[in-house]
A protein has these predicted regions:
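A glycine-rich, hydrophobic/aromatic-adjacent loop/helix-cap motif
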Residues: 1-220
Length: 220
């Protein structure tokens, strides 16, 4: 179960202990990534986080403002091989990230300043377990036209997990057969599709992957 208690107790980290050391980050590496990223934080700015995947429906970190936003220059991509959570080393799934090109609609969350240190710890433990992402300070555009600096976790194209082929047909085949302690990989895709619909948003790429998965279910 992915929740605050699991992260605080260490149970979430423990559920990934089967991963090889070249993939699983240590707590020291996670803490260093957080420190390095916050050292680049825009001066005097509150911390906003851009959610484009499960942060849209299960943010875990406490926030005091939420708004719809668009991140220009980045697109959703199931380009990360998933060895834990909703996949295994034997049957890896695909994890969502952002790659260059296009635009992405999502939400921005302003982390609660009163508990900012804890919220960031929870966020980094959740997102940076394997170093599959690169935390980046970006600029998002709100529905009002205003802009905000926001953290976005984009694909790290260097580690073992990155896959260049993230076409809907390719990723759907991997996602269809992947399961793990957090459930099926396909369930994630359908939850993402619903979260987008709940925000009156669409993503053609996500829809293609979801439809391909439905095709597998129909023929199985």
């Amino acid at each position: 179960m992915l929740n605050r208690d699991a992260i605080r107790s260490g149970a979430f980290l423990e559920s990934f202990s089967h991963l090889p050391p070249e993939i699983l980050w240590t707590q020291a590496q996670i803490a260093q990534s957080l420190a390095d990223t916050m050292a680049k934080r825009p001066a005097g700015e509150e911390v906003w986080v851009f959610g484009y995947g499960s942060l849209m429906w299960n943010p875990l970190s406490h926030f005091d403002q939420r708004a719809y936003a668009t991140l220009h220059g980045w697109r959703r991509s199931f380009c990360i091989r998933l060895f834990g959570g909703r996949g295994t080393p034997q049957r890896p799934g695909r994890m969502l990230a952002l790659e260059r090109g296009g635009d992405t609609q999502g939400v921005v969350l302003r982390l609660d300043t009163a508990t900012l240190e804890e919220e960031l710890h929870i966020l980094w433990t959740r997102e940076m377990l394997t170093g599959a992402y690169t935390p980046a300070w970006t600029t998002v555009t709100l529905a009002t036209g205003k802009t905000r600096h926001a953290l976005a976790f984009v694909a790290n194209t260097c580690p073992h997990q990155y896959e260049a082929d993230s076409s809907p047909a390719t990723v759907a085949r991997a996602i269809a057969q992947a399961h793990g302690p957090l459930g099926s990989n396909a369930e994630y895709v359908f939850q993402l599709r619903q979260a987008l619909a709940d925000c009156a948003m669409t993503d053609a790429y996500v829809e293609e992957v979801a439809q391909a998965l439905e095709g597998f279910e129909t023929t199985s």
